[in-house]
Amino acid sequence: MAKMLKFSEEARRALERGVDAVADAVKITLGPKGRNVVIEKSWGSPTITNDGVSIAKEIELEDKFENLGAQLVKEVASKTNDVAGDGTTTATVLAQAMIKEGIKNVTAGANPILVKRGIEKAVAAGVEEIKKISKKLSSTNDIAHVASISANSEEIGKLIAEAMEKVGEDGVITVEDSKSIETYVEFTEGMQFDRGYVSPYFVTDPEKMEVVYNEPFILITDRKLSNIKPLIPILEKVAQTGKPLVIIAEDVEGEALTTLVLNKLKGTLNTVAVKAPGFGDRRKAMLQDIAILTGGIVASEEVGINLEDLTLNDLGRADVVRVKKDETIIVGGHGDQEEIKKRIAQIKAQIEQTTSEYEKETLQERMAKLAGGVAVIKVGAATETELKEKKHRIEDALSATRAAVEEGIVPGGGITLLRARKAVEKVVNELDGDEKIGAKIVYEALIAPINQIAKNAGYDGAIIIHKVLENDDPAYGFDALKGEYCNMFERGIIDPAKVTRSALQNAASIASMLLTTEALVVEKPEPKNNAPMPEMPEY
């Protein structure tokens, strides 16, 4: 395949045109008065969004050289989105500002490698300043503010705050379609897994077709139970206590199942048999989770624990166990809290190490079940287009809120990046030559987000910046929605520190790469075949 090449100045200018195409489409969405972008879809209704990464991902330019620049900006947006779940528009605006200023200086003769070094030093100082300004989330109100700003809706902010309050820091919150036009939160307390009773004869509430036992013993094993003999000793011990017994096993069949059903029907022993959740290694891990949560052990031949040798102390306990046809919920497990915390920490470590998205999701789900619950935000809307857009905003706001819990919050509205200039200015004064130019590029770029927010809201950015910097309070800023100067923390205009930090780091990373680019290589497009169709022969 033949290639086309461009070098030095010509190459950088082509990249810049590509960067501008994406950034100009994305930056109009920034701030409380940002506009929407309508994206055509090859099938289904068009998407209406103000999410930077969604817009960037859809842009593909005809000119192959310019398209390389567009792809680099997409990388900024998606990297920021992956790490922090928000801040994609801010990252794009910063990248565009750094690239514009950088290309100007490199064209004037600055050494790109030294410029890159200066950029890196300035960004490191900026990141440190962001960390200093940040403060921990102190209330549900703070969480609601972070979510409201990300989703651009107070109603969504309140829903996310409610969900987070219920499931805690390690809990799982999922987003699903609602069957009505209402948007609300559903909460499942305790550990829930999608396996139900082996036989409907175990049902205690025929109306709801479910089994409900209070204060039951829980026998956990990874074996298939078909013979009743190994179970007899422990069944007798449980029967003497008068408490119910929940058996979680790989499967229960044959003689074992018949005996358990007969005991239940006669009233000798209230019991229910449930299939173990998951498959393979995942099943073993989930059984171990249930054992730790309920304070029991897993009876497994692998570790030499036989069913015949089990005592009441080896069985798990819980306040309530509910079993339906396809789901089981264990509420109020009697496990040791320290052991549960250790298990959660272990799963957290696994999440950090894994690279597979699917693996990450299943581990987070397990962690949430141990931590005490799952919340589902059911999203409702009048049309499919509105539903897609609303769902997307909620998912974004969730990611931003988690980022805020992790690294704290900073004043929003571009104020934190503006304040970080003070630290960057020190670096500019310490450096000289082309490194100084690199640091100066970052210094100038840090005003781009607040400028754009002001512009989108119809204000003059220069006047706002001057007025904000007159006040030394790092939380003092400009509310673009109401057109007032205020304390950003008190007004609830806040961003997660992680989002602001990631936006700056990713923008600088791509800008540095682009400035040090000296050649572009792309594939030559195939010539279109314009030859006329041959005439059909006459017969």
From Swiss-Prot:
It catalyses: ATP + H2O + a folded polypeptide = ADP + phosphate + an unfolded polypeptide. Its EC number is 5.6.1.7. CDD domains: GroEL. Keywords: ATP-binding, Chaperone, Cytoplasm, Isomerase, Nucleotide-binding. GO terms for cellular component: cytoplasm. Its main location: cytoplasm. GO terms for molecular function: ATP binding; ATP-dependent protein folding chaperone; isomerase activity; unfolded protein binding. GO terms for biological process: protein refolding. Belongs to the chaperonin (HSP60) family. Forms a cylinder of 14 subunits composed of two heptameric rings stacked back-to-back. Interacts with the co-chaperonin GroES. This is Chaperonin GroEL. The gene is groEL.
